């Protein structure tokens, strides 16, 4: 598709050539060995760390005309939902936690991945391309587990860009904190934002 559309001149305009790519690992389809959707089984697509029938389904890619600084790029694939202060973890109708203690201790916030892709515009100027694809806030029941996860996946970026709120954040390499106050950034992706 890339070569049939993006890199082909269209409507009298020159073709766009993306020399740099970033393809992160994603949580969709990665088996958790837990019954995360409470259907009595542990091997369905709803039991993966992110809904998916196979690892990598619904993955994402960043295409860039500018160099990607892979050394400074960060991923948050394994950040645990419980580690977000005030996390909106779902509850049953009787106010008991929806997820068991074991499930909560292993449940990742990101249904795909959250990535801070550092793109170098000039030798002295770069910006942070903050990409994610939160779970749709539907396909659940009264516990609203997907709606709550979607909320916190979007909230993650709000905290990440706010130095006073990002101290709890850790990336997949164990580095803590978010952006500094003077960082340039763009938030992008299919956020599936719930208007309610």
Language model feature labels by segment:
Residues 1-95:
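Active-site surface patch of divalent metal-dependent phosphodiester/phosphate bond hydrolases
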Residues 7-12, 20, 137-196:
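Metal-dependent phosphoesterases centered on the DNase I-like endonuclease/exonuclease/phosphatase
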Residues 12-16, 53-57, 108-111, 120-124, ...:
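Extracellular/periplasmic catalytic domains that process cell-envelope and extracellular macromolecules
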Residues 20-23, 60-64, 72, 116, ...:
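Structural recognition of the beta-strand scaffold that forms the well-ordered cores
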Residues 52-56, 107-110, 143-154:
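Solvent-exposed, acidic/flexible segments
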Residues 65-70, 87, 109-133:
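Beta-strand-turn-beta hairpins that frame and shape the catalytic cleft
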Residues 90, 97-103, 139-149:
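Acidic/histidine-rich helix-loop elements
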Residues 96-120, 158-178:
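A Trp-anchored, charged/polar loop motif used as the substrate-binding/catalytic surface
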